[in-house]
Curated annotation (Swiss-Prot):
Gene source species: Bacteroides fragilis (strain ATCC 25285 / DSM 2151 / CCUG 4856 / JCM 11019 / LMG 10263 / NCTC 9343 / Onslow / VPI 2553 / EN-2)
Record Gene3D superfamilies: Nucleic acid-binding proteins
Matching PANTHER family: 40S RIBOSOMAL PROTEIN S11 FAMILY MEMBER, SMALL RIBOSOMAL SUBUNIT PROTEIN US17M
Subunit and interaction comment: Part of the 30S ribosomal subunit.
Summary of the function given for this chain in its UniProt record: One of the primary rRNA binding proteins, it binds specifically to the 5'-end of 16S ribosomal RNA.
Source organism superkingdom: Bacteria
UniProt protein name: Small ribosomal subunit protein uS17
Family membership noted in the UniProt record: Belongs to the universal ribosomal protein uS17 family.
Keyword terms, alphabetized: Ribonucleoprotein, Ribosomal protein, RNA-binding, rRNA-binding
Any one of the GO BP annotations: translation
GO cellular component labels: cytosolic small ribosomal subunit
GO molecular function: rRNA binding; structural constituent of ribosome
Pfam family, one: Ribosomal_S17
Amino acid sequence: MISLMEARNLRKERTGVVLSNKMEKTITVAAKFKEKHPIYGKFVSKTKKYHAHDEKNECNVGDTVRIMETRPLSKTKRWRLVEIIERAK
C-alpha cells in the first residue's frame, strides 16, 4: 500500500508558459509536449492548455511556471501553481 506522502509525490507535474491571468486566482498555462504519430512515426509538437490555481495572483503573462495536479477546485481547475521558474521580460 502506498503511504500518503508517496502518493503526494506521484502527482503529475507540467511546465508551461502563462497565457492568461485575467481570472481571479486562476491562470491559463500552455504546456508543450512531443508525441509520436501512430502511423508515420514522426514526432509532432502539441500544446495543451490547463487552468491552474494561483492563490496569491503572483503570475504574469509570459512567465514560465511549474504546475501540479490536485483535487478539483472548480469546474475546470484541477492543477495548482507550484513555482514560477522564470519571470517574463
